[in-house]
């Protein structure tokens, strides 16, 4: 949850659950072999060390992704969906979490 996904990948370590923005990572169209060589740095959050122009990180309240042709396959919490466009919108504090007193939602889980 938060800034981690996929078994501990943290591509944008500065992301926080409470910062009010979606942190998006756009990986330029690279081959699977090329991405495999970059994945360690990407997963560790060292995107600033990657070659210029391969990855773009930005923040937004709304992200809309449209397929140039065909459908996109989107996976959300293990469920796959197919559509021509996907819109992600940040909901402002719509979920309440209960945690032990003094627990910081932005603290590192590691």
Please annotate each region the language model reported:
Residues 1-110:
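Long C-terminal subdomains/extensions of small-metabolite kinases
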């Amino acid at each position: 949850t938060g800034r981690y996904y996929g078994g501990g990948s943290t591509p944008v370590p500065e992301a926080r659950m409470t910062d009010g923005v979606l942190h998006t990572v756009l990986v330029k169209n690279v081959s699977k072999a090329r991405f495999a060589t970059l994945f360690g740095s990407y997963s560790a959050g060292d995107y600033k060390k990657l070659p210029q122009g391969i990855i773009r990180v930005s923040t937004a309240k709304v992200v809309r992704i449209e397929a140039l042709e065909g459908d996109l396959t989107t996976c959300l919490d293990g469920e796959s969906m197919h559509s021509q466009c996907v819109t992600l919108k940040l909901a402002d504090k719509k979920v309440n979490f209960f945690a032990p007193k003094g627990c910081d939602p932005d603290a590192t889980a590691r």
